[in-house]
């Protein structure tokens, strides 16, 4: 199962990124654990300087921007290969 983490302070951009990730998972019909990480200490300890950030299986895939649903789907599909 893939683990998708959205690191951010709960701002509107963070919520939009979470919704995009959720939609990508639904569209691909895959099982995933979606996690919101809002603890500032955890965010900084992971090296994120510009939230929101998208981590897939522990790897940062986007930072400081909101990838669209199709881009996230491509990231998830690429991961499976």
Which stretches of residues belong to each language-model region?
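Short helix-loop-beta junction
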Residues: 23-31
């Amino acid at each position: 199962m893939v683990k998708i983490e959205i690191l951010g302070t709960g701002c509107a951009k963070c919520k939009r990124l979470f919704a995009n990730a959720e939609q990508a998972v639904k569209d691909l019909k895959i099982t995933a654990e979606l996690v919101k990480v809002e603890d500032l200490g955890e965010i900084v300890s992971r090296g994120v300087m510009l939230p929101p950030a998208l981590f897939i299986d522990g790897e940062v895939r986007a930072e400081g921007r909101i990838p669209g649903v199709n881009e996230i789907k491509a990231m998830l599909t690429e991961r499976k290969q």
